Amino acid sequence: MTAAPLTFTLPDLLANFPWKRNLSEYYPECKTESSAWTESFHPFDDEGLKGFNLCDFNLLASLAYSPREREIIRLGCDLMNIFYVFDEYTDIADGDGADKIRDIIMDAFRNPHKPRPEGELLVGEMARDFWIRASGYVSPDAHCLTHFLRDFDTYTAAVVREADDRAKRVYRTFEDYLSIRRDSSGCLPSFALCEFGLDLPEEAYHHPRMAALREQSTDLIAIGNDIDSYAMEKARGLELHNSVELIINEHGLDVQGAINWLERYAAGVHASFLDNVANMPSWGEDVDRRVKMYIDGLAQWVRGNDDWTFESGRYFGDKGLEVQKTRVMSLLPASKVSLRSRPKAVGHVPKKLLRYFRYSTMYFFGFHVLAK
């Protein structure tokens, strides 16, 4: 007799979060434009393109940056799609391969007016084109440009470290893992785009309470993502990079016990976030208005990422809204067929990287879902 699948409950970490779902009115047009822009670089084969469209990272940007103007929504869509392509390419590489891809994308950001070499991985040209438009939206001396480049560099370095950990099967403690995850999640460069057009004073940006808000926003996003994606990552053998699995091993808990532990941890982060918002210093009426827009941007990122998790096909296929309502998940065995998007091999991905590619999919409640 086949054993019944493990069933567990997903907590609603944002049940009492003051910021509610908000979708930008510019979503349809920006999705059309950004999808066409991304596809113009031919990053995936036909199967991979289906996976890319199912994820709908344009929806993520339109939820996360929803309070902002059209230009930021479009830049946000492009940035999310760059993240996806970069992650897909580095996911099939070891540390050395990921480091080479990192060098390409960072050189493109730092030298956007330098033509990219013929035959180079397409992430370089994607980053170059994006950064010319993004940097042109603000003054050349805007602090947000420096913040973005610094944070994207930190992000790519952390992704390389994760790739090396993956190749070596490194098992980290939760605190050590969370420290890396804060960088590898890509939240900080995503938050940097929230600054564009606000001209925040450095005093406000670097204030300890503001720095804490960025870290707490990242933690809420990362922990929520780990809980929601655990079943999928477990089935794919990637649970070493998920806090649920790490807590299971650190504290000797079962899956639900580990999720409950993380729920309590996230509740503390949530309380600290609200405390920092309530006790932010004043820098005068005009600056305070811009600071509020920035804080709303961070908070909307937390809310928007959670909404996107269930509204896109990234983690739950077409059952996301059902899972969001019932909060019940089942962990079932992996199948051998992959629905994951794949980097297009010919002319884009070096053959030496392709050997690291892993095919997998799984079933939740009898339906296929896209692998992370």
Swiss-Prot record:
GN (gene name): Agr9
The protein's role, per its UniProt record: Terpene cyclase that catalyzes the cyclization of farnesyl diphosphate (FPP) to various sesquiterpenes, including gamma-muurolene, beta-cadinene and delta-cadinene.
Transmembrane segments: none
Positions contributing to (2E,6E)-farnesyl diphosphate binding: R314, Y315
Keywords of the record: Lyase, Magnesium, Metal-binding
Cofactor: Mg(2+)
SUPFAM superfamilies: Terpenoid synthases
Residues bound to Mg(2+) 3: N225, S229, E233
Protein name: Sesquiterpene synthase Agr9
